[in-house]
UniProtKB/Swiss-Prot annotation:
One of its GO terms (biological process) is regulation of DNA-templated transcription. Interacts with GyrB. Inhibits all the catalytic activities of DNA gyrase by preventing its interaction with DNA. Acts by binding directly to the C-terminal domain of GyrB, which probably disrupts DNA binding by the gyrase. Belongs to the DNA gyrase inhibitor YacG family. Gene3D superfamilies: Erythroid Transcription Factor GATA-1, subunit A. The gene is yacG. InterPro entries: DNA_gyrase_inhibitor_YacG, Znf_NHR/GATA. The lineage of its organism: Bacteria, Pseudomonadati, Pseudomonadota, Alphaproteobacteria, Hyphomicrobiales. Zn(2+) binds at residues 20, 23, 35, 39. It comes from Rhizobium etli (strain CIAT 652). GO terms for molecular function: DNA topoisomerase type II (double strand cut, ATP-hydrolyzing) inhibitor activity; zinc ion binding. This is DNA gyrase inhibitor YacG. Pfam families: YacG (PF03884). The keyword Transcription does not apply. Keywords: Metal-binding, Zinc.
Length: 70
């Protein structure tokens, strides 16, 4: 096998195992970043029902901006 052919075949490393965002168990490659299909579906359900939301102020003049000083 020629040397230039070996250099072209680069293998990428797998992602690091991270804790599942739902239960904390090590993540599974098939369901990444979750550990199982159940945890993946629980997270999807929370997105679809609106459990994950960015809080907004009804009136912009009453909004708290932590970076600004009064």
């Amino acid at each position: 096998m020629p040397e230039d052919r070996k250099a072209a075949a680069k293998v990428e490393p797998l992602r690091k195992t991270r804790p599942c965002p739902e239960c904390g168990k090590p993540s599974n490659r098939e369901h990444y970043p979750f550990c199982s299909n159940r945890c993946r579906e629980v997270d999807l359900s929370r997105w679809l029902t609106g459990s994950y939301a960015i809080p907004v102020a009804e009136d912009e003049t009453k909004a708290d901006y932590p970076d600004e000083e009064n």
